[in-house]
Amino acid sequence: MKTSLRLLAAVATLSAACATTSAQGPKTAVKPQDLAGTWSSPTCESIGNNNYIQRHFTLTENTWTLNLVAFGDAQCQAKLFTARIQGPYTLVKDSEAVPGATEGNFGFGELYMTPHMQPLADAFQNAKCGSGTWKVGEEQRTTETGCLFFRPTSACGTDHDLVKVEGNQLFFGQRPADNDMCAPEKRPAALTALPVVKR
């Protein structure tokens, strides 16, 4: 159980990989049409402490959805939970810190969680995530309550992030240790080493 909770903390630092912004200007390196499509982890991603994830993004020119699946094994076969996050996004301006990257704000419109094992269903229940009874394999909305290390949207409605596209690879900003990208001054100054790949 401690491993699962550590995994939740580690995954929360990646869960967004996303944020909200204003109209796209013609001089930005990344444009909404560059982001539109389906992007997924090319492999089972290690996030340390024997914790693993796969990220699956679906973006239009103004909305984003992330299905983040956490696993208990290096082959990404043993599912622990899925976090589904969705909302609007806008691109702001080119990053001064990272050449070729564009600042983006990704809004947290909705948050849903699905436990895939009973200990996590119990943990979600004990943490008062959502408003119903947690059952393995059943998704529940947690937008207002948050869930363990995922904040309610009222506490953090937007991630201030970076995006960069290189061929069929999409990079987001490197999330800070405290997972706080809720204000413009918290925007990353570097890209994550692990991209997602266009499908």
Which role fits each region the language model picked out?
Residues M1-L8:
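Bacterial N-terminal signal peptides that target proteins for export
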Residues A9-L14:
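Hydrophobic helical h-region of N-terminal Sec-dependent signal peptides
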Residues Q24-S40, H56:
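N-terminal helix-cap/turn-to-beta initiation motif at the start of protein domains
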Residues Q33-S41, T63, P99-G104, T143-L148, ...:
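Short, hydrophobic/aromatic-rich segments at coil-to-beta transitions
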Residues T38, S46-S131:
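N-terminal glycine/threonine-rich, aromatic-flanked beta-hairpin/loop signature
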Residues T43-I47, P176:
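Short polar catalytic/cofactor-binding loops
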Residues F81-V98, G137-R199:
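Edge beta-strand at a domain terminus
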